[in-house]
């Protein structure tokens, strides 16, 4: 049947439904923010802090946002999609083959399901939207530029790179190099003024930011700022509750996440009474509970003592090797780059080097010129080489000692 063939080329799909949910959720958030701003500035106008004209401006923004949300809620595309296939199905007679009849029936069922889900998503404000993995490039940064103010220098200037799924990448640089700004870009705290960030092939926009963040887990420098519960268990549970995880599954998820970082026996302990390394383990467990594909460590070892520092670095390697997570570590700790698959060197807002650790460490004079210390292990390997003792690149001192013993 020609009409059925034509329908198959123009019909709406589950991807269209997901795109609808993303737009719906984005418009809902915009409406809430505009409405909250209006009521906040309404009070400010009463106190004489802003003029009536300014208040009218906020009121108009609120009205506009409500209309935009209402318009997308009244979208008829899924109803039209069902209407079209219903006509085709009803016009299909017994003269057609059983194959054609079955195909038309399948299309009708799919269209009904799409319409029902679209209707339900309106009630749920599009919260069920998800992004799918379109490729195996975990993070792709293209021509990224950012200034904190028009007359400021670029904090990021034409930065481009790719991080593949399952890679451990260290982003290194001194203070002011641009690595912290890059970190904020990756997690969506800042928006690019030029260029863009893609996660698994999805260009990140304000509309799909919430969905893109589901791929990410973040571990910050100071875990104390993340703790809100009276126990380790409560802190891990907090993130799950926010993501509307089934309560029946929550206990197992909490235990499994804690066990992955060796904290399963500390679930009843108060986080603030733990050591620095243990606190970071709790922060990692909280991130792992949501099962992200990508874990971003933002100066996660900089406030730890040597023991805690070493423990967290070992966990980061395990996350890559055993759990197949993509690891991005924003750091100024040059020793950490020895564990990485790839190193990105930032300076003056630009990416000045990218490559394997051993490739980057060959440029010792350049690294020193941009105020980066050479890892002690690398200096030892260099000294051995100068004495005619050739060794392979080692990730830690234990590996180097084993090579020397052989």
Swiss-Prot record:
InterPro entries in alphabetical order: AAA+_ATPase, ABC_transporter-like_ATP-bd, ABC_transporter-like_CS, ABC_transpr_CbiO/EcfA_su, ECF_ABC_transporter_ATP-bd, EcfA_1, P-loop_NTPase
UniProt domain ABC transporter: residue ranges: 139-373
Family annotation (SMART domains): AAA
UniProt EC number: 7.-.-.-
Keywords: ATP-binding, Cell membrane, Membrane, Nucleotide-binding, Translocase, Transport
PROSITE patterns: ABC_TRANSPORTER_1, ABC_TRANSPORTER_2, CBIO
Cellular localisation: Cell membrane
Gene Ontology MF term list: ATP binding; ATP hydrolysis activity; ATPase-coupled transmembrane transporter activity
Predominant subcellular localization, coarse grouping: membrane
Cellular component terms (Gene Ontology): ATP-binding cassette (ABC) transporter complex
Pfam family membership, one: ABC_tran
Topology of this chain in the membrane: Peripheral membrane protein
Enzyme class, spelled out: translocase
Keyword Cell membrane applies: yes
Binding site for ATP: 173-180
Domain of life: Bacteria
Family named by the database record: Belongs to the ABC transporter superfamily. Energy-coupling factor EcfA family.
Record function comment: ATP-binding (A) component of a common energy-coupling factor (ECF) ABC-transporter complex. Unlike classic ABC transporters this ECF transporter provides the energy necessary to transport a number of different substrates.
Quaternary assembly: Forms a stable energy-coupling factor (ECF) transporter complex composed of 2 membrane-embedded substrate-binding proteins (S component), 2 ATP-binding proteins (A component) and 2 transmembrane proteins (T component).
Protein's name according to its UniProt entry: Energy-coupling factor transporter ATP-binding protein EcfA1
Natural source organism: Mesoplasma florum (strain ATCC 33453 / NBRC 100688 / NCTC 11704 / L1)
